[in-house]
Amino acid sequence: MSDLSNFDVIIVGGGHAGTESALASSRMKCKTLLITHNVDTIGQMSCNPSIGGIGKGHLVKEVDAMGGIMAKAIDQSGIQFRILNTRKGAAVKSTRAQADKILYRQAIRHALEIQDSLFILQASVEDLIIKQNKVIGVVIPKIAIEIYAKSVVLTTGTFLNGKIHIGMNNFKGGRSGDLESSSSLSQKLRDLSFRINRLKTGTSPRIHAKGVNFDCMSVQNSDSPLPVFSFTGSFEQHPKQIPCYSTYTNKKTHDIIRLNLNQSPVYSGLINGISPRYCPSIEDKVVRFSDRDAHQVFLEPEGLTTSEIYVNGVSTSLPFNIQTEIIHSIFGLENAHIIRPGYAIEYDFFDPRDLKLTLESKFISGLFLSGQINGTTGYEEAAAQGILAGINAARYVQNKPGWYPRRDQAYLGVLVDDLCTYGTKEPYRMFTSRSEYRLSLREDNADLRLTTVAREFGLIDDNRWRIFCLKQENIEKERQRLRNTYIFPYSEDIVQLNRFLNSPIKNKVSGEDLLKRPEMNYVKLMQLNTFQSVKLDYQVFEQVEIQIKYSGYLLRQQEEIKKYLYYENTLLPIDINYHDIAGLSKEVIDKFNDCRPYSIGQASRIPGVTPAAISNVLIWLKKQGLLKKNVKCT
């Protein structure tokens, strides 16, 4: 990098959002600079060492479908793989993997270092250069330089004015062991038009394996066959697999916590930031669920070359000596040694209602925000926002319109719509229950939903595109074959078939119709000579089975989506003055001005906006000749 003065895109932060942003914009042929305060912590897992889970696994698959790195990195570093929710159907089935933190970080950094058009700089950004409400660069006082760019993506995680708490002691820092915290950048941003609040998150103690009695615990091995995250990955890429373990807290544990709540920075009032609802500290669990005598605890190895274990389920910010008592009270951990204490961290976040759905600021052109800075929690939520921000930062540079997925198109669409429409007062976590179209938004079809549009953006290379097109072709061929292949009551396979069925067939039936039966699946079908064919890739026959088995429900959901798209594609003018619309209450006008919805669909989802108010807006648009449709729904 001979010229530090000008870039197309600057990414501030090297976490899970920043790395996806940097890779996306550079793949789209934009000269990109990723600035991080420590290159050795690029891709660091600051909390638990895992990727995926319910709802989160869907986001990882979507990032992969658009050419992102997270799924590939966990395939190369995962040491325990499982599929969750297998009994609840394909829609909510989610992949989760335990990671070797060192291997994961290495995989991410390697991807950055070999990427064309991408440069890395170790430095701390303390200010933005803004002219006429447009960002044009960043300021790095410690090395006395200014770097200019056409767009900037902020992915600062918990480092904006971060404060770490352990008991009554606190100190500045973005995470434990990393005392870098950007209070100056936070203050500069406060001086702009952004609404800024505080959130809190926390992490569990890490212990040494040699003091753990694993014999009294339940063992959790990897699933067989081994799951794979990336659509182009394989289980052969996985390193050695090792188990996780589970145990429980008990009455003694809870008594220790209750006795020392006065030393908790949360319960003593020292912390004002709002905690994550769905990842509560052990103190919160004991207080909120006082009727429970035990809470499950998972022991998660942090890697193949370390004896460090993450004690998942015991997130705490109590003093170190109390943490030691808590750990020693848990079955199997009586002699465990704490390597790193748990802690809580408070940090600044920006109200995401101040962002467009492209994650660009509504006030500062060319400035994009992604990750925990927008009020989310989790590596997966950060990565998903990161790839979206990177795409749109590049499209901004290329003078192309911004892009965002709809709610019916991706969990990423649900994520950004929830954030930008409702905002958040607590760390936002993705769940499958947040999507009204989850039957259509499955892990298995993320590539079918998003890879084509990613190819248009330049995120998918020729080899990946060839593999994807072949998969689509094979799915269609197999569906057609099963649709046109019949078995008859007098066929030689009929006896074996009837063993599979709850009721015998009396007339000819196609392979497609057989797969619609709940007791039938593709593996059983292929045991019949009538339907046997060349061996298909697992992704192909899984997709064929799901598309056929859920066809009736999917058609019904498509009808719902058509109704949703009518309002979603009815666009609202950017400069609309809601005071001009008769019949709107002051409350509704204030809500519209607060959110500045892009469409009737988004406007209708704002809490407190009534159907009558939406009707008034539609009538006004029609009278003004402004009833416009967004024809291209991508």
Curated annotation (Swiss-Prot):
InterPro entries tied to this protein: FAD/NAD-bd_sf, GIDA_C_N, MnmG, MnmG-rel, MnmG-rel_CS, MnmG_C, MnmG_C_subdom, MnmG_C_subdom_sf
Principal subcellular localization: cytoplasm
Example GO biological process: tRNA wobble uridine modification
GO molecular function, one term: flavin adenine dinucleotide binding
Disulfides per UniProt: none
Cofactor requirements of the protein: FAD
Cellular component, GO annotation: cytosol
Record Gene3D superfamilies: FAD/NAD(P)-binding domain (3.50.50.60), GidA associated domain, C-terminal subdomain (1.10.150.570), tRNA uridine 5-carboxymethylaminomethyl modification enzyme MnmG/GidA (1.10.10.1800)
Compartment(s): Cytoplasm
Chain positions recorded as FAD binding sites: 13-18, 125, 182, 372
Entry keywords, A to Z: Cytoplasm, FAD, Flavoprotein, NAD, tRNA processing
SMART domains, alphabetized: GIDA_assoc_3 (SM01228)
One Pfam family, short name: SAM_GIDA_C
Positions contributing to NAD(+) binding: 275-289
N-terminal signal peptide: none
Family: Belongs to the MnmG family.
Function summary: NAD-binding protein involved in the addition of a carboxymethylaminomethyl (cmnm) group at the wobble position (U34) of certain tRNAs, forming tRNA-cmnm(5)s(2)U34.
Subunit structure and binding partners: Homodimer. Heterotetramer of two MnmE and two MnmG subunits.
Name of the protein described by the UniProt record: tRNA uridine 5-carboxymethylaminomethyl modification enzyme MnmG
Organism listed in the record: Blochmanniella floridana
Top-level taxonomy: Bacteria, Pseudomonadati, Pseudomonadota, Gammaproteobacteria, Enterobacterales
Gene coding for it: mnmG
